[in-house]
C-alpha cells in the first residue's frame, strides 16, 4: 500500500468530534472505549474504501433520515460496539423486516463487518465508525429507534474505572428519548459485576421501562441473539453470561 492515507485510514482519527470550553481549551471527555492499535488489513481497508457509500454512514450533527437511507419505514435497531460484526450481520440476515445500524470505533471490525455483510448479501444494515454517545446525541432523532443492543461492552473492571462504563443513568436517559413506544433495550455481559451494575441502573427507570424478566432481573439466553466470540470466550473461561431485556412503556 502506498503511504498516502485512504478514507479508511483517516476514519480512525475522526471517531469523535473535538469539543472546547468557552475560553477555547480542549475539553477532555470520559470515554467508554479505548482506541486499540489493531492493524487494519489491506482487505479490510479495501472493504471500507470501496463500499462505504452503500453500507457506511458518517457522523452528522443533524438526525439521519432512516426512510431515505433504507428505502422503507421498517423499525431501526441500533447496536453499539459490534466488534467484528458477524453476529450483527447474522441478526440482520435473520430479520429482513428490521433495519440495523451498527456503531464500532475500531476500523478493523468495521471493515470485517462490511465484508461479511457483502458475503451474506445483507441490505438492511449500515455501519458507523464514530463515538456512539455523539451519534445518539446528534444524529438519531427522538423516538426513531425500535431498539438498542449492547452486547459485551468493555466492563472496565477496576472500581476507579467504573465511571467509564457506557451504561450509566445519563446514557439510559438519552436512549429513552431515542426509543419509540415499546422500543427495547437489550444488554448482555459476561461480567457479573457489570450485569448487576446494568440492572441497578435500569431499575432507576422503572416508570419508563418494563423488565421482561419473570424474576425481575435477568432473562434466559435468547435464541435470537447470535453467539459472539466474546460469549464463546466467556464459556471457555467458565464465566456466566447475563442478558437484560427491557421495553419502553407507551
UniProtKB/Swiss-Prot annotation:
GO terms for molecular function: tRNA (guanine(46)-N7)-methyltransferase activity. S-adenosyl-L-methionine binds at residues 79, 104, 131, 154. Pathway: tRNA modification; N(7)-methylguanine-tRNA biosynthesis. It holds the Pfam family Methyltransf_4. The active site is at 154. One of its GO terms (cellular component) is tRNA methyltransferase complex. InterPro entries: SAM-dependent_MTases_sf (IPR029063), tRNA_(Gua-N-7)_MeTrfase_Trmb (IPR003358), tRNA_methyltr_TrmB_bact (IPR055361). Keywords: Methyltransferase, S-adenosyl-L-methionine, Transferase, tRNA processing. HAMAP family: tRNA_methyltr_TrmB. Catalyzes the formation of N(7)-methylguanine at position 46 (m7G46) in tRNA. Belongs to the class I-like SAM-binding methyltransferase superfamily. TrmB family. This is tRNA (guanine-N(7)-)-methyltransferase. The lineage of its organism: Bacteria, Pseudomonadati, Pseudomonadota, Gammaproteobacteria, Pasteurellales. The gene is trmB.
Amino acid at each position: 500500500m502506498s503511504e498516502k492515507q485512504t478514507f479508511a485510514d483517516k476514519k480512525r482519527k475522526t471517531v469523535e468530534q473535538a469539543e472546547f470550553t468557552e475560553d477555547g481549551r480542549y475539553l477532555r471527555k470520559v470515554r467508554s472505549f479505548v482506541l486499540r492499535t489493531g492493524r487494519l488489513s489491506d482487505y479490510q481497508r479495501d472493504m471500507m474504501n470501496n463500499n462505504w457509500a452503500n453500507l457506511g454512514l458518517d457522523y452528522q450533527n443533524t438526525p439521519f433520515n432512516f426512510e431515505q437511507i433504507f428505502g422503507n419505514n421498517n423499525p431501526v435497531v441500533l447496536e453499539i460496539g459490534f466488534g467484528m460484526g458477524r453476529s450483527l450481520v447474522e441478526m440482520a440476515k435473520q430479520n429482513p423486516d428490521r433495519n440495523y445500524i451498527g456503531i464500532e470505533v475500531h476500523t478493523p471490525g468495521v471493515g470485517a463487518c462490511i465484508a461479511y455483510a457483502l458475503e451474506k448479501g445483507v441490505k438492511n444494515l449500515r455501519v458507523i465508525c464514530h463515538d456512539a454517545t455523539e451519534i445518539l446525541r446528534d444524529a438519531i432523532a427522538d423516538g426513531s429507534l425500535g431498539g438498542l443492543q449492547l452486547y459485551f461492552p468493555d466492563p472496565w473492571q477496576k472500581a476507579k474505572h467504573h465511571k467509564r462504563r457506557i451504561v450509566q443513568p445519563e446514557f439510559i436517559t438519552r436512549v429513552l428519548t431515542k426509543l419509540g413506544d415499546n422500543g427495547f433495550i437489550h444488554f448482555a455481559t459476561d461480567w457479573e459485576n457489570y450485569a448487576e451494575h446494568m440492572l441497578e441502573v435500569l431499575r432507576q427507570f422503572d416508570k419508563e421501562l418494563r423488565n421482561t424478566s419473570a424474576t425481575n432481573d435477568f432473562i434466559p439466553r435468547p435464541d435470537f441473539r447470535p453467539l459472539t466470540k466474546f460469549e464463546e470466550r466467556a464459556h471457555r473461561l467458565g464465566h456466566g453470561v447475563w442478558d437484560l431485556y427491557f421495553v419502553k412503556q407507551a
